[in-house]
Amino acid sequence: MSAIREKVNISERRACRLVGLSRSVLHYDAKPDHENEVLAARLVELAHERRRFGYRRLHALVEREGTHANHKRIYRLYREAGLAVRRRRKRQGVMIEREQLALPGAPNEVWSIDFVMDALSNGRRVKCLTVVDDFTKEAVDIVVDHGISGLYVARALDRAARFRGYPKAVRTDQGPEFTSRALDQWAYANGVTLKLIQAGKPTQNAYIESFNGKFRDECLNEHWFTTLAHARAVIAAWRQDYNEQRPHSALNYLAPSEFAAKHRATADAPAAFQELV
């Protein structure tokens, strides 16, 4: 409007009349929506607590708290607050064809296991054995130590099985710990099939590779461990949060434990119905 007035040298009243605009509309000062202010403040708070979460996971968290908002609205507030997650630079590698893994139909059908390396502040190496249920996406265990042998792996899997039963199969790469006699004997004794992926084809173990990426990005890269005990405590807390709170995109943004509980309830329903009949 000011541009029109300057160009033809007329009053504000006449300019408004010529373009059919009310002067009250011209001077209307939009008041910020209190609901949006509260929601934006909560998004900022959650983003500071979970620095590596994008707007989709933050949306899932506020929905879980009872705040129902369209994802477009969440994205707008997220961008306006300058909360876009800075992507870490990935190493350039050779392009390889991804292979689609068959999704198991129930918990404990297939566990995937792998190692993730890190270091303490003094430079000493830390080795993390990650164990994931391919169906529920639960982090069954994350074992942290300076060294982990094949026998150590077998004992760790035994410990996990005490709480949730033995898996039908375990998928691994061909690392020496996973091709050891100790793990082979453990699998035979417990009726577990060992599924070894082909050498040089990590995409055949895509579920654990995806988990390891999240583990490194959201936990290992966010902390500076001073001792082995410190590393174990932080990683255990992250694993619990991952299982019980973190929205998982492959599970329609349910947390893995929440998804597993809903699956158990659904699976138990037919049996309960039969008992009533």
Swiss-Prot record:
* NCBIfam families tied to this protein: transpos_IS3
SUPFAM superfamilies, alphabetized: Ribonuclease H-like
Question: What PANTHER family would the database entry show?
Answer: BLR2054 PROTEIN, LOW CALCIUM RESPONSE LOCUS PROTEIN T
List the source organism.
Burkholderia multivorans (strain ATCC 17616 / 249)
Q: What is this protein called?
A: Insertion element IS407 uncharacterized 31.7 kDa protein
Which GO molecular function terms does the record list?
A: nucleic acid binding
Q: Which GO terms describe its biological process?
A: DNA integration
**Could you tell me which Pfam families the record lists for this protein?**
HTH_21 (PF13276), rve_3 (PF13683)
